[in-house]
Amino acid sequence: TTLSDKDKSTVKALWGKISKSADAIGADALGRMLAVYPQTKTYFSHWPDMSPGSGPVKAHGKKVMGGVALAVTKIDDLTTGLGDLSELHAFKMRVDPSNFKILSHCILVVVAKMFPKEFTPDAHVSLDKFLASVALALAERYR
């Protein structure tokens, strides 16, 4: 998935509108992922509470969106920009890269729900392509 200049500017503009709510987006998206795709819970079995809105879910949701924020700043070279995160997920945490797509979908759902006015069809396409590109960049070290 190649991001066009239009995609990049659309994502940056959308991020400018939604970034103040990034922690809430992350917490909701991660909570949804764990509830809707229970197989993803295996990575978080050390948490005392995996329910939506719990402390660990909120904390990790914040971390996830910190990664998305980083990706927005590295949008012109995601593979290099997200190299350390890819390394961490591939070798230290051994996360199956298919889970990045699942979480990307949950992020899209939450952005659509929280920002219906901003989530235009153009924003939807560009954010979807961006998150797919982020997932691909995170999977880079698995090869």
Curated annotation (Swiss-Prot):
The keyword Membrane does not apply. Heme b binds at H89. O2 binds at H60. CDD domains: Hb-alpha-like. InterPro entries: Globin (IPR000971), Globin-like_sf (IPR009050), Globin/Proto (IPR012292), Hemoglobin_a-typ (IPR002338), Hemoglobin_oxygen_transport (IPR050056), Hemoglobin_pi (IPR002339). One of its GO terms (cellular component) is haptoglobin-hemoglobin complex. One of its GO terms (biological process) is hydrogen peroxide catabolic process. The keyword Metal-binding applies. This is Hemoglobin subunit alpha. The lineage of its organism: Eukaryota, Metazoa, Chordata, Craniata, Vertebrata.
